[in-house]
Structures are given as structure tokens and as C-alpha cells.
């Protein structure tokens, strides 16, 4: 895998990825507690980019219209639940928001990696690592494995959605088999957490 030219070749940057509701956050939290390394969270940068008054915020409101603003927010924040619903249901809108945010998220992650240049190891949590082509900012990729039924149930509970809606969202992402071809490490997050904990302890 070729490394992005703006990044330090000697730094170890672990890209943690996996399907939606596969358990990435739980694993990232454990890694942070176990070896206390900086965590760069793509989802958090995505949220930051669409904060009120930002350039992306203005573009999102102009594109989707005033209804995308949360009417219950005192700061006129984007209604993220509505935005998610729209982009999950409409491929054109999904492509638009991805084209807007993904390059900026990648740019932010590169900037943060360089800020932590003296750290030997960083953890980059990137849900759409393969789909958004973020592989070149990682020196290795750790993929979370989770049974489809478990993943679906977690997503239904977390997002308060139907089984049909959960399945549609899962189907939008690359399947595990395709992702696993490009992963360096598989973390099995089925029923026994000790499986992936043992794997992590061996690797860090």
C-alpha cells in the first residue's frame, strides 16, 4: 500500500474500520485505555465540518433547503437524523454529501497525523475507510468482524429503526468479504470480546 506523500513513513497509523454497528467505538475505547494513544475519529470530524456558520453548513443548507435545519436547536444546527435518513434513501444526495465531506475529512486527518508526528502510534477510526479510499493514510488496516444478524440488531436498537431499514443501511456498505481482502488484521467481535482483546494485546 502506498502511503500519502504528506505523511511520515515511520509513524504507525492503524486504520480501524468495519460495518455500521459492528463495534468499532467499543474497540477504539479499549485500545485507548490499553495503550493510551491518540484517536482520530472521522465521524467526529464529519460532525465538526457541518457546525453552524461553517462553509460546509452553508452548502448543506443551500443544497437540502431550510428543512434540514433542526427546528428545536437554539443554534440552528443541522438535523443530523434527518440528514442521515435522506442520504441513506437517496443515492444522488448521498454521493453529493460524500463528495463534499470526504476530501475535507481526509485533509483533517492528515493534518492531525502531522500534529501528532512525535507519537509512534495513532489510531484512525474510519467507518468508510475502503469506500472513501482512505487507505493511503494508514500503515495498516484493522477490520472489525461482526455477524450480520448481531450487526442488524445493534443498528435497530441504536437508531430505533425497523429491520428492513437496518438491512438497507447495511447493504449500502461494502460487504465484509470484499473488505477483508485488503485488511491486515481481523478483529472478531462476535460474542466473545476476549477474542479481539487478545488479538490487540499481541499487536500493540
Swiss-Prot record:
UniProt subcellular location: Cytoplasm
Catalytic reactions of this protein: 3'-dephospho-CoA + ATP = ADP + CoA + H(+)
GO terms (BP aspect): coenzyme A biosynthetic process
Domain DPCK: 13-204
InterPro entries: Depp_CoAkinase, P-loop_NTPase
Pathway it works in: Cofactor biosynthesis; coenzyme A biosynthesis; CoA from (R)-pantothenate: step 5/5
Positions of ATP binding: 21-26
Enzyme Commission numbers on file: 2.7.1.24
CDD domains: DPCK
GO CC annotation terms, alphabetical: cytoplasm
Main location: cytoplasm
Keywords associated with the record: ATP-binding, Coenzyme A biosynthesis, Cytoplasm, Kinase, Nucleotide-binding, Transferase
Enzyme class: transferase
One GO MF term attached to the UniProt entry: dephospho-CoA kinase activity
Function: Catalyzes the phosphorylation of the 3'-hydroxyl group of dephosphocoenzyme A to form coenzyme A.
Family to which the UniProt record says this protein belongs: Belongs to the CoaE family.
HAMAP family: Dephospho_CoA_kinase
UniProt-recorded name of the protein: Dephospho-CoA kinase
Gene name of the record: coaE
Amino acid at each position: 500500500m502506498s502511503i500519502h506523500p504528506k505523511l511520515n513513513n515511520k509513524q504507525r497509523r492503524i486504520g480501524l474500520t468495519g460495518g455500521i454497528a459492528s463495534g468499532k467505538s467499543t474497540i477504539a475505547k479499549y485500545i485507548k485505555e490499553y495503550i493510551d494513544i491518540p484517536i482520530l475519529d472521522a465521524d467526529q470530524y464529519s460532525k465538526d465540518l457541518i457546525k453552524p456558520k461553517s462553509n460546509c453548513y452553508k452548502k448543506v443548507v443551500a443544497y437540502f433547503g431550510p428543512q434540514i435545519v433542526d427546528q428545536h436547536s437554539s443554534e440552528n444546527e443541522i438535523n443530523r437524523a434527518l440528514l442521515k435518513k435522506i442520504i441513506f434513501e437517496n443515492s444522488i444526495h448521498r454521493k453529493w454529501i460524500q463528495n463534499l465531506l470526504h476530501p475535507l475529512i481526509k485533509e483533517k486527518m492528515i493534518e492531525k497525523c502531522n500534529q501528532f508526528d512525535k507519537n509512534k502510534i495513532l489510531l484512525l477510526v474510519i467507518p468508510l475507510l475502503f469506500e472513501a479510499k482512505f487507505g493511503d493514510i494508514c500503515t495498516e488496516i484493522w477490520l472489525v468482524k461482526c455477524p450480520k444478524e448481531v450487526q442488524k440488531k445493534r443498528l435497530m436498537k441504536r437508531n430505533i429503526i425497523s429491520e428492513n431499514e437496518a438491512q438497507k443501511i447495511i447493504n449500502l456498505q461494502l460487504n465484509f468479504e470484499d473488505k477483508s481482502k485488503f485488511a491486515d488484521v481481523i478483529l472478531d467481535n462476535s460474542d466473545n470480546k476476549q477474542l479481539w482483546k487478545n488479538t490487540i494485546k499481541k499487536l500493540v
